[in-house]
């Protein structure tokens, strides 16, 4: 079998069936995905990664995880953002954004020591990821001290409800403390009460700020959450 572009070929296997994201792969697709993993060292996302074990680690991402990260985000959108969270016509036409090259760069050369990309899963597989760093300049609240931000946290639909998201968030909070942040923020969609409930359970609270976002192809509002980090790990 000839694999001309391992990233594109693996993403084609992930996206070809549309939504809802399948929880099983055909034998032919599974063989192709495993071939890509063996030949190129590419980490596999679900459904090719199977289900996470109880001892799956949280680790710093490498370039080998980039395709899996892109795939997890695409699959999570299709599972979590239907039903009015985002417009169906946008979801029907969505692409891989950002591209795999973005995640390769993020893993290989972080913008600063205050940026970190984490994945949930042993080397060779990924079930979720978290991207973190300083608060984006457009989102800085001048009334607050310098803060860190969780830019993105996605867990694959197959792996949700198994504690990986909470562990990613806890690991990120420990790292934020280590690099000197006492306060962290993140955004959720106003139309996504499930995500808001998750963050509340992890100790995050709304700041009261609502930020309108217009990407041209889709517009929505984001709700800002924040949490103060104390030195005792709470």
Model-predicted regions and their roles:
Residues 2-67, 81-84, 223, 230-234:
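Conserved N-terminal entry element of GNAT/NAT acetyltransferase domains
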Residues 16, 72-75, 174, 201:
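Residues within well-ordered alpha-helical secondary structure of globular protein domains
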Residues 159-163:
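Glycine-rich phosphate-binding loop
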